[in-house]
């Protein structure tokens, strides 16, 4: 009864399609957030609940959905692919699309890198962020640059594998955590470590705990946090 009477309802797409509480219900507007991670059939199912508007919000260059299925080739194509919003040649456009092309979060150097290599130079940085750029670097061990690459190729640090096939690398984990600790000691309230592999995230998380450091959980604003790319996204 509560869901039927509510003017605004928030739910996951899985619950929307599987929970009988939504049977027969429709809404004037349906907003689908993080749409790049959804299967197209899920978006169609959500759209079926909208009587007037379906708004899809997401990043056409983020990771697509993951599928373990015989139909994975189809399911792993996101809505932006099906609508041909991004054609892979640097052209983005669709009569239905509104692009939010000004970013307010990243250091300008990071945004410029993403803009050049991912968004065909369409991403811009807001002026206040540009003006405070040097302030963002003050607590970094390498305060002259917002972007640093550390080459481990000469350290003989081979990856290990779990039974499920996920990778982990002890040396890489130690160095990543050392960098995070250095930034934390220099005054950064929160430091995030991102890795492609769940096993590596678990390894670094355990290192953080073993060293007695504060492992930043969801909802807190200080400490060191490590997760996979998909978990962050």
Which residue ranges define each predicted feature?
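Conserved helicase motor core of SF1/SF2 NTP-dependent helicases
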Residues: 14-16, 20-233
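Conserved helicase ATPase core
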Residues: 1-6, 71
